[in-house]
């Protein structure tokens, strides 16, 4: 007999917003300002429709039909893109921006990778259903039918393609299909009850997501590797103070881009988690960082291979 997992088993580390730590993490995500702005607005509308209603009263009092169209969008946002593109870090921290923007407290429920299950019959369906049960239970207590929500809940499912593969896939197990159906039902439950909650899905494999899941997305934000301008901003902002001149930074920008037509450039995480620490460690503890040593480091480093998105 299957036992419903506890709240702590499903969500090992719930995060409350606003808070300084996620605010700082969000600020460190340079080069993604457009995605930050877009996602915070979308989630703000989903978890606190009162905000846009007040905006409409002030600026467009006769635009009820247009506003209703915006508010009827399903409470799901998909963040899709290559590995190391910043989508998971953004999903884990954007709640802080939304909480400050809407002036409400928000709790993030990140679905633990350890809860994917061991393949027992009915387990995936049970896990997905339980995740939505806890999300809906918490959001229902925060609902306010007469004004601004008293708070909100964000359910984050990382590596979402593991939960929501296309039911059209001939190799898909019956149990997986049932898990997808449970996910779709969960999205519909939040929408139908008009709860202050939204679901964030992160995936490397957008094409693998079930069409019904994609149709329920209020927005699909795509993430790619940083272009020249983004890499320049990232490298310049992170390396300021190390004595590297503009010519050296430009050379680092070039070397972290595609080195031939068939090769990808560096990801955001390649630069922030591998390259910059390696530049510092190459000099530490007896030497200052030099242009020569920095260029040596980047020349020896290869970017993370591109993820091939297949159905």
Curated annotation (Swiss-Prot):
A Pfam family per the record: AAA
GO molecular function: ATP binding; ATP hydrolysis activity
GO process annotations (BP): defense response to virus
Keywords attached to this entry: Antiviral defense, ATP-binding, Nucleotide-binding
Alphabetized InterPro entries for the sequence: AAA+_ATPase, ATPase_AAA_core, MT-severing_AAA_ATPase, P-loop_NTPase
Disulfide bonds: none
Coiled-coil residue spans: none
PANTHER family noted in UniProt: AAA DOMAIN-CONTAINING, VACUOLAR PROTEIN SORTING-ASSOCIATED PROTEIN 4A
Task performed by this protein: Regulates complex assembly in a CBASS antivirus system. CBASS (cyclic oligonucleotide-based antiphage signaling system) provides immunity against bacteriophage. The CD-NTase protein synthesizes cyclic nucleotides in response to infection; these serve as specific second messenger signals. The signals activate a diverse range of effectors, leading to bacterial cell death and thus abortive phage infection. A type III-C(AAA) CBASS system. Binds and disassembles an active CdnC:Cap7 (Cap7 is also called HORMA) complex, inhibiting the complex's ability to synthesize cyclic nucleotide second messengers. An AAA+-ATPase remodeler, in the absence of foreign threat Cap6 (also called Trip13) probably maintains the Cap7 protein in its open, inactive state. Once activated (presumably by a bacteriophage protein) Cap7 binds to and activates its cognate CD-NTase (CdnC in this bacteria) to synthesize cAAA, a cyclic nucleotide second messenger.
Family membership noted in the UniProt record: Belongs to the AAA ATPase family.
Subunit structure: Homohexamer. Forms a 1:1:6 CdnC:Cap7:Cap6 complex.
Entry note about domains: In the disassembly complex (PDB:6P8V) Cap6 (this protein) crystallizes as a right-handed spiral; the top 4 subunits bind ATP while the bottom 2 do not. A CdnC monomer lies along the surface of the hexamer at the interface of subunits 5 and 6, with Cap7 (also called HORMA) at its tip, over the central hexamer pore. The N-terminus of Cap7 extends into the pore, contacting 5/6 Cap6 subunits.
The protein, known as: CD-NTase-associated protein 6
The organism of origin for this protein: Escherichia coli (strain MS 115-1)
